[in-house]
């Protein structure tokens, strides 16, 4: 057990880094919750965990698919990031269409007077009694950045767990079988999803409701969530490495 941990310190560090990136990335994602669903708050009308998990799982699937065709680490991580970015971008743009053409409101933020990216006035278009509505440009860009961080983090965790399985398998039988189709790939994926969910839930308590993106005052709370995620990711990494080692590796 101790040997398994000491022999996979590098991959455990990558798992922790991945968890931190996920936690940090969640703070970038514009989440409006139930108020946004009624066009009374800026962001996507769903919860923090649901939105972050959707992007993260898409990134994990993209990274897993890329591992079928290459073992190039940068390509695998980039694939995870792009997959997550596409998912969150499509979600936000479709949401914007509904807000604009369905509800009939202009995407605007109540947190800033001027959009930091487009420099367009925001306060003129915020309806009375609301905290903004739709997904303005700054929130869209922020969401794509957050998805990229989440995708990279999820890919790091998944890749690291696969490498742990491969290294344990090499030590036990002297030769490793193909990763594709191996039963422990499912175990690694489940652990990766679990670690992702843990690090997505922590920021949701930190945010405490809605957040518009990196321009939102709540974004400044991210260091607290990151510290908590480091601790949680260490525990998750230890459990995951021990479990995969005890199962015999890949």
From Swiss-Prot:
Highest taxon, organism lineage: Archaea
Places the protein is found: Cell membrane
Pathway: One-carbon metabolism; methanogenesis from CO(2); methyl-coenzyme M from 5,10-methylene-5,6,7,8-tetrahydromethanopterin: step 2/2
Biological process (GO), any one: methanogenesis, from carbon dioxide
Record-level Gene Ontology MF annotations: tetrahydromethanopterin S-methyltransferase activity
The enzyme's E.C. designation: 7.2.1.4
Mode of membrane association: Multi-pass membrane protein
Catalysed reaction, written as an equation: 5-methyl-5,6,7,8-tetrahydromethanopterin + coenzyme M + 2 Na(+)(in) = 5,6,7,8-tetrahydromethanopterin + methyl-coenzyme M + 2 Na(+)(out)
Main subcellular location of this protein, as a coarse class: membrane
Cellular component GO terms held in the UniProt record: cytoplasm; plasma membrane; vesicle membrane
Swiss-Prot/TrEMBL keywords: Cell membrane, Membrane, Methanogenesis, Methyltransferase, One-carbon metabolism, Transferase, Translocase, Transmembrane, Transmembrane helix
Residues of the signal peptide: none
Residues that span the membrane, as ranges: 9-29, 47-67, 75-95, 138-158, 184-204, 225-245
Pfam families: MtrD (PF04207)
Function according to Swiss-Prot or TrEMBL: Part of a complex that catalyzes the formation of methyl-coenzyme M and tetrahydromethanopterin from coenzyme M and methyl-tetrahydromethanopterin. This is an energy-conserving, sodium-ion translocating step.
Family: Belongs to the MtrD family.
Oligomeric form and interacting partners: The complex is composed of 8 subunits; MtrA, MtrB, MtrC, MtrD, MtrE, MtrF, MtrG and MtrH.
NCBIfam families: mtrD
Protein name stated in the entry: Tetrahydromethanopterin S-methyltransferase subunit D
Species, as recorded: Methanosarcina mazei (strain ATCC BAA-159 / DSM 3647 / Goe1 / Go1 / JCM 11833 / OCM 88) (Methanosarcina frisia)
